[in-house]
Amino acid sequence: MAGVLGKRRTVHGERVPATGSALLVMNHVSHLDPCYDAVFVHSHGRVPHFLAKHSLWNVPVMGAILRGAKQIPVYRGTTDAQQSLRAAHEALANGQVVVIYPEGTITRDPDGWPMASRTGVARLALEHDGPVIPVARWGTREIYDGYHKKFRPLPRKTVETRLGEPVDLSAYREQPETIALLRDVTDLLMGEVKHLLADIRGEQAPEGFHTSANTKRDED
């Protein structure tokens, strides 16, 4: 489906490791993101395991794909949220590739920049030794804008995915885990994603992260 709806372009896809675990930290702008991100990871010889908002499992076609691929739904605000994080820890411990959208939902920033993100990504990143790779993707919202219910497959758009270098978290792993530390690591990772997104868009990234009444910063 991804190839039909839009052309794909990947920059530095070789940074996906051929073997072993990896945590791919990505921005989230459209319900189409998992489709493109799954194709991107598969095209580099790996099987992605998604941590994504559970409501995606109710989206026609998308839900069937996610269920069939045995992906990991995240139930925000319930005891099941911790179970989802545990499943992601197990996937990384077993040498798998996990894709996470730390914003927890499609960004509410009017211009599509990342929102303040949830700290579960920091826990995953700090507790495993595999590479933590920031990844930005842009173009899916131009095809399907979920908040405004706009579907514009034509003319065909280009969806670009750009990978950064693995983030060195060794200094953080030596420190006691605190809420402040988790927040710093989360903002560091999403800052890298934001800068990659700025490169794709050819624009200056805004300072900080978008927040709104619906954006909850503390969690998981």
Residue ranges, per PLM feature:
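Catalytic core of membrane glycerolipid acyltransferases/transacylases, capturing the structured
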Residues: 18-78
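Residue-level preference for the first positions of well-ordered beta-strands
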Residues: 21-23, 97-101, 133
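Hydrophobic/aromatic ligand-binding patch that stacks against planar heteroaromatic rings
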Residues: 40, 65, 90, 123-127
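A charged, well-structured terminal subsegment
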Residues: 86-91, 159-195, 199
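Catalytic-site beta-strand/loop segments enriched in glycine and acidic/polar residues
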Residues: 91-121
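A cross-family acyltransferase "interaction/gating" segment
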Residues: 111-179, 212
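Short, highly charged C-terminal tails/helix-capping segments
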Residues: 201-220
